[in-house]
């Protein structure tokens, strides 16, 4: 049986953080190493995703070309993966001739098979920049929480957004308000595959249950998929001069193109007529649907390709029980971690801390505790005691007559065999936590045996040899089973044993062992916590400076008197105030404008009590286009001044009737 293992493509707009390592790369590497350890034919391919708006944005901000950003972060990401001992048979990039050619072949085949069609859509267009604006090129106010938001996502409340949902949208290049225009995009007829995708998911026995459940929920309401974008940087759509393929149709094709780079062997892994191969995709939870629904849909549309056997989806990682944020520097970068600790410690911690399919947290205190009291006090203790005692007493691993072993010796060796079989089964089910727990249990048994036998007190040399032989067998099994999880530390243990990576004890001369597992000190943890807080504070300072610039008007364009004259400002009086459900900031306000009453949604919770607002005369912009905030329509805007945390509504210094115009 052949195995193809793939990892989600890392996006080249930044280096890797611990969340990437936990959900995707470490488990995929453990799985690959283990299959290779068992002598099975397996290749591991991965790479970087090099196209899309975030990369062009970064390039524009830095005044460089997109390829410069791609080159920088492709190399940085590969260095991060190398530092974690993540091994690939090929690590490619989507901005390469073979990938672009393969992606265009896939697209053309989808079109030939009737799965691509044209459709008019509404999209923001900036007159000043003379360009259609992709989602990340538009920013504004989130309609749900009133926080600053991008066209695809609100960092404040975490909601996915469409650009046209933003309140007061503006082009990030020139700050002008874009208009909505109609344009033609290309769509993938995914809805036509609803029944076949459902059948595929339901009949994939190796697909994890949580992935099946998520995929089936999406398939129930399957829609066609916009697969083109009005940008220049990407894989050009065949026959189209002004659009490129959306990254989520072309990036997964990288799994095929990167395998192609290994030669004709790619056919034995990917083509439909090769029944003796399995495909396992390791990904993060946030892109489960893309791999369990969209990607299989593409493969079905092409025809002739094998479907993935398993989509192994790793849960989210929080940091100190808070959502990680790269913009706020609330994150631990891989580079910073490996400069301070062994990468094996991270591999161990992530796999033992929670099942892969569950969300989990990285806490510096928990990390220290698990490494010191579990890994070192159990596994480190047994391996060190066995090596030191055996080397000092015999100089080599003793070889004994197996028929002379006592029942307690045979029982422990039998436990080793049972553990090996159980670990094998668990790893093949992607259950890395329980597999690692079985190895820890075996080390506990070894510690108990060592302590109970008290080899330092045994006077009979033959019996002492039997005891230390038994301990050496346990040690060899631990090294063998742990090697996929902790390749660095087990390589050192194997070097001191002077053995090969298998389950046989040969009696070779031992090397004088040194301490392999060193404890994580309180000083180490204090330093890492301090570094995290410093980085976060630095990000907050930058954010504050940016906010001050916006508030001070540095980004505002000059307008003429005619433009100002188009704004309908009037005196209004607040009649009713109530909190908007599901919002921590918003009031629903009914205001009297003299000739009519208006409903206005405003983020004044925390600045004013509801009772304080009733009866107050305020200035209202009356000709704003209505917008929905948290599902409640707002038909205007109250004018207010703001400085840091202080918000003050604008009012009149003389009493005027409601409806009076402001000039």
Swiss-Prot record:
It is found in: Cytoplasm. Its main location: cytoplasm. It is an enzyme of class 6 (ligase). The keyword Nucleotide-binding applies. Binds 1 zinc ion per subunit. Keywords: Aminoacyl-tRNA synthetase, ATP-binding, Cytoplasm, Ligase, Metal-binding, Nucleotide-binding, Protein biosynthesis, RNA-binding, tRNA-binding, Zinc. One of its GO terms (biological process) is methionyl-tRNA aminoacylation. Its cofactor is Zn(2+). A motif ('HIGH' region) lies at residues 10-20. Residues 563-663 form the tRNA-binding domain. It comes from the Archaea. It catalyses: tRNA(Met) + L-methionine + ATP = L-methionyl-tRNA(Met) + AMP + diphosphate. Zn(2+) binds at residues 142, 145, 154, 157. CDD domains: Anticodon_Ia_Met (cd07957), MetRS_core (cd00814), tRNA_bind_EcMetRS_like (cd02800). A motif ('KMSKS' region) lies at residues 323-327. ATP binds at residue 326. One of its GO terms (cellular component) is cytosol. GO terms for molecular function: ATP binding; metal ion binding; methionine-tRNA ligase activity; tRNA binding. Belongs to the class-I aminoacyl-tRNA synthetase family. MetG type 1 subfamily. Is required not only for elongation of protein synthesis but also for the initiation of all mRNA translation through initiator tRNA(fMet) aminoacylation. Homodimer. PANTHER family: METHIONINE--TRNA LIGASE, METHIONINE--TRNA LIGASE, CYTOPLASMIC. This is Methionine--tRNA ligase. It comes from Methanococcus maripaludis (strain DSM 14266 / JCM 13030 / NBRC 101832 / S2 / LL).
């Amino acid at each position: 049986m052949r195995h193809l293992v793939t990892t989600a493509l890392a996006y080249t707009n930044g280096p890797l953080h611990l969340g990437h390592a936990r959900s995707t790369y470490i488990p995929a590497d453990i799985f690959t190493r283990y299959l290779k350890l068992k002598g099975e034919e397996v290749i591991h391919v991965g790479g970087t995703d090099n196209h899309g708006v975030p990369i062009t944005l970064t390039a524009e901000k830095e005044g460089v070309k997109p390829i410069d950003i791609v080159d920088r972060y492709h190399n940085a990401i590969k260095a991060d993966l190398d530092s974690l001992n993540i091994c690939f048979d090929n690590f490619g990039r989507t901005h390469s001739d073979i990938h672009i050619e393969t992606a265009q072949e896939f697209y053309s085949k989808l079109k030939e098979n009737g799965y691509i069609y044209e459709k008019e859509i509404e999209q923001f267009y900036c007159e000043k920049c003379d360009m259609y604006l992709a989602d990340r090129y538009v920013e504004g106010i989130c309609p749900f929480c009133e926080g600053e938001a991008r066209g695809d996502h609100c960092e404040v409340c975490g909601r996915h957004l469409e650009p046209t949902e933003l309140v007061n949208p503006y082009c990030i290049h020139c700050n002008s308000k874009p208009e909505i225009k109609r344009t033609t995009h290309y769509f993938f007829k995914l809805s036509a595959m609803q029944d076949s995708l459902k059948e595929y998911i339901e009949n994939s026995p190796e697909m994890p249950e949580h992935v099946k459940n998520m995929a089936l929920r999406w398939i129930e309401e399957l829609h066609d998929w916009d697969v083109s974008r009005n940008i220049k940087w990407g894989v050009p759509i065949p026959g189209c001069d002004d659009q490129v393929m959306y990254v989520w149709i072309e990036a997964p094709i990288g799994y095929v193109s990167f395998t192609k780079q290994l030669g004709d062997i790619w056919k034995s892994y990917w083509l439909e007529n090769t029944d003796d191969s399995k495909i396992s995709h390791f990904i993060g939870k946030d892109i489960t649907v893309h791999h369990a629904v969209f990607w299989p849909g593409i493969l079905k549309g092409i025809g002739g390709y094998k479907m993935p056997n398993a989509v192994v989806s790793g849960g989210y990682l929080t940091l100190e029980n808070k959502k990680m944020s790269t913009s706020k520097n609330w994150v631990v970068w891989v580079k910073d971690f490996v400069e301070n600790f062994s990468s094996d410690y991270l591999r161990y911690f992530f796999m033992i801390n929670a099942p892969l399919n569950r969300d989990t947290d990285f806490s510096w205190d928990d990390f220290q505790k698990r490494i010191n009291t579990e890994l070192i006090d159990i596994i480190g203790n047994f391996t060190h005691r066995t090596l030191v005692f055996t080397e000092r007493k015999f100089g080599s691993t003793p070889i004994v007559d197996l028929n002379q072993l006592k029942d307690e010796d045979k029982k422990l060796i039998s436990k080793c065999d049972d553990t090996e079989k159980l670990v094998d089964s668990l790893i093949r089910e992607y259950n890395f936590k329980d597999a690692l727990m079985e190895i820890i249990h075996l080390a506990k048994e070894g510690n108990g045996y060592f302590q109970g036998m008290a080899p330092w007190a045994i006077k009979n040399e033959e019996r002492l040899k039997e005891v230390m032989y038994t301990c050496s067998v346990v040690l060899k099994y631990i090294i063998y089973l742990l090697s996929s999880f902790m390749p660095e530390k087990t390589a050192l243990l194997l070097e001191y044993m002077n053995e090969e990576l298998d389950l046989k004890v040969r009696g070779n001369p031992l090397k004088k062992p040194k301490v392999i597992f060193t404890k994580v000190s309180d000083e180490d943890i204090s330093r890492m916590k301090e570094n995290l807080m410093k980085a976060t504070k630095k990000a907050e300072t930058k954010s504050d400076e940016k906010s001050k610039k916006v508030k001070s008007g540095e980004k505002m364009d000059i307008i003429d008197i005619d433009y100002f004259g188009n704004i309908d400002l009037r005196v209004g009086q607040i009649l009713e105030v109530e909190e908007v459900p599901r919002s921590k900031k918003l009031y629903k306000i009914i205001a009297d404008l003299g000739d009519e009453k208006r409903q206005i949604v405003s983020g004044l919770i925390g600045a004013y009590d509801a009772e304080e607002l009733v009866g107050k005369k305020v200035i209202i912009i009356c000709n704003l286009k209505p917008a929905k905030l948290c599902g409640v329509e707002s038909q205007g805007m109250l004018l207010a001044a703001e400085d840091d945390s202080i918000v003050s509504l604008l009012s009149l210094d003389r009493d005027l009737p409601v409806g009076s115009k402001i000039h």
